[in-house]
Amino acid sequence: MVAASLSPRALYEEVAELLRQRIFSRELEPGSWIDELKLAEQYGISRTPLREALKVLAAEGLVTMKVRRGAYVTEVSERDLTDVYHLLGLLEADAAGVVATEATDAQLRELQALHQELEAAAVPGSEDRVRFFAINERFHMQLLAVANNRWRDQMVADLRKVMKLNRHNSLLKSGRIEESLREHRAIMAALVARDSAAAMQRMHEHFKNGLEAAA
């Protein structure tokens, strides 16, 4: 890839996104050293925008900068996971409570449509784990959008980036797809019933169980 092929937005932002996807796909594995010279050559750029991109990823928690050693893909510890899931549970439970009382009927129908896609991706015998988790994230992002708090949205977006570093573990746990789907059904039922307290509780339980699957 050469620099000329990158989009018009700031070069370092484009490079950050390319690296972000390589980290999420585990092409760049947790704990691995990031070879700046090799990457700069691959992308046909100087090391300056690459270093700016690494600073962005470091701010997101995806990359760890070590003095005189360079940049490494962050390894997520058990404590990191506990902290991230705890905060996500608080933030998204609060959002679910807001949605239960303030969402329009049309907005709830949109969430129900996403939930049906989730059901379709989890049909026994033909379940698609990658698609399931992609739709799952869309559902959560849509719920946050309905709750309409940009500061919460930004915090959740950053936390979810760190969560993705460990997603492969939860994907591999036997039965997690079915468990997650049951939890989503309970969340959706509480939202449709306009039961704020139940929606908050079901969402909190969802993240508690998600942590157990990811650990």
Regions found by a protein language model. Give the residues of each.
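Amphipathic, non-transmembrane alpha-helical scaffold segments
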Residues: 12, 85-88, 132-136, 177, ...
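Alpha-helix N-cap/N′ positions at the starts of helices
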Residues: 68, 91, 113, 179-182
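Short linear motifs at protein or domain termini
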Residues: 1-101, 106, 200, 211, ...
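Conserved amphipathic alpha-helical segments that form helical-bundle/coiled-coil interaction surfaces
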Residues: 101, 105-169, 181-190, 198-209
